[in-house]
A protein has these predicted regions:
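A general secondary-structure signal for short beta-strands and their flanking turns/coil
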Residues: 10-14, 100-102
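A short beta-strand micro-motif
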Residues: 14-22
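Short N-terminal binding/cap micro-motifs at the start of the first secondary-structure element
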Residues: 24-29
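Short, Lys/Arg- and Gly-enriched loop/turn segments at beta-strand edges
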Residues: 55-65
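Short, compact, well-ordered microdomains
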Residues: 67-111
Length: 111
């Protein structure tokens, strides 16, 4: 009980999520995907802020699924993923799970 109460008082970092770039694999779409009317609403440069490691309002659910564990870890003050992967150890570059048109997101701790 004491540990649970103590953990709830820890200050969590805010985490900024920035949409960096989308790639489209037209050859794969033509070969495998059924035509769809509506795809991703995310725009390059779009930003969200995660507070207390929670999904920001308006964030694509599929993108959040891909990055959630990294955002939660950064919010708790953890970082240095994969032992020196990123120049900024309190950040990560994550792509969404859309195999035809993945979006890359830069996630970083902010003050």
């Amino acid at each position: 009980m004491y540990l649970c109460n103590r953990v709830s008082f820890l200050r969590m970092n805010k985490v900024r999520i920035t949409a960096i770039r989308q790639t489209e694999y037209h050859d794969l779409m033509e070969q495998y995907e059924n035509p769809i009317q509506h795809t991703c609403d995310v725009m390059e440069g779009q930003q969200w802020t995660s507070v207390d490691g929670k999904c920001p309002e308006g964030m694509c659910p599929a993108a959040w699924y891909s990055m959630r564990e990294f955002v939660e870890s950064l919010a708790r003050g953890e970082g240095n993923f994969y032992d020196g992967w990123m120049k900024n150890p309190m950040s990560a570059m994550i792509s969404c799970i859309d195999g035809f048109r993945p979006f890359s997101f830069y996630i970083e701790v902010i003050a």
